[in-house]
Amino acid sequence: MKKTFVSAAQLEQIAAQYPTPFHIYDEQGIRENARRLNAAFSWNPRFREYFAVKATPTPAIMKVLQEEGCGCDCSSLTELMMAERIGCVGEHIVFSSNETPAEDYRLAAKLGAVINLDDLTHVDFLERAIGYIPKKIGCRFNPGGTFSLGETREGFQVMDNPGDAKYGMTRAQIAEAFRLLKAKGAEEFGIHAFLASNTLSNEYYPALARMLFRLAAELQQETGCHITFIDLSGGVGIPYRPDEPANDIAVIGEGVRRAYEEILVPAGMGDVALYTELGRFMLAPYGHLVTRAIHAKHIYKEYIGTDACACDLMRPAMYGSYHHITVMGKEDAPCDHKYDIVGGLCENNDKFAVDRMLPGIDIGDLLVIHDAGAHGLAMGYNYNGKLRCAEVLLQPDGSTRLIRRAETPEDYFATMVWDD
């Protein structure tokens, strides 16, 4: 059974201060998780986690992770601007994007970010955009075919078939890119790859590492390029369902270390730095979407209507994803009622849960939707004129602070051009 990081009584007090719906994050949990990750890879002296800003683009959260030694993985102009705003610059930023506008490359270069190129044609595009090729640069690899550990767990559906993915370069293209970049002045090279999403296996990172380590050794020998970093990107997942096993980051780190010792060290590459770009793993379990039951509807099914909707958490509507739900104050009550938990959008897929067995829900009950700390508010939108909700940080001393206010109608109308 999943546990909330706030009690029912505590949450009622918080909800009295910040009207529902809102996202709330557990600062202590975020910090402890970041420390576990850093410990798991401490054998690599230059290891750094670059938090995937796209997962939770909130400055206060980025700052917490920065204090724990993390950099920022940015993929757009505004994400770069947020990183700069919190004082994250230089090699503390990795810029991994695709179909990248020239303006984005210019800001990444200005900030001194480590740029990962997604395509061979971007070598010349980048040079035209900024006027030079950076001394340190990476390229994204796509091996094609399929990438599988022989498992069929929820979460592999997003990118377990690299051959169908729009990202990265082929083996021949990445070798050509390295040679071209070297001729244009690059001195330090890196390899990046992202091949699966939300993996629930301690073997994903080690398997990816073995692939990239072999590629790095081959490319350094073939091209003469000095490879100084390998970016494992993201993909380490979290168990959304209570009965799913969690990844053990210490076991994962040890598996990567063994691959490093077996492949890179004998190749004379024992100084290569490892990077990760985790988002979901860093944040998802440490964020709740808090909503209140405001309606009960009894037709062909039993519905509980909430004051949140898919605009606040779109994963269930978009992907059919499971998010666990706790009825606060009824944690120990029997789950003997079958409900669809829904929002108020004019779309029938606006459902947080379908045929979910839960305790009996009364109007006014607070519901916690678990694992909403990543790709929650970040994927929010304004369909039906809905306004994005607030974000609250639960601090280690039990106090709370507002880290993003709720949108207002004035925000919604701000970009509109009226005829009157």
Spans of model-derived segments:
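A charged N-terminal "starter" segment
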Residues: 1-136, 181-187, 221, 226, ...
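General structural feature for long, well-ordered alpha-helical segments within catalytic domains
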Residues: 10, 26-29, 33, 37, ...
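Conserved, mostly hydrophobic/aromatic
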Residues: 30, 54, 76, 108, ...
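Active-site-proximal loop/turn and secondary-structure-junction residues that shape catalytic pockets
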Residues: 55-57, 78, 99-101, 119-121, ...
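Structured core elements
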Residues: 71, 94, 116, 138-140, ...
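Glycine-rich, aromatic-flanked loop segments that form ligand/cofactor-binding clefts
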Residues: 131-148
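Active-site loop/helix belt of alpha/beta enzymes
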Residues: 144-294, 358
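Charged (often Lys/Glu-rich) extended helix/loop segments that serve as interaction or gating elements
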Residues: 261-264, 269-420
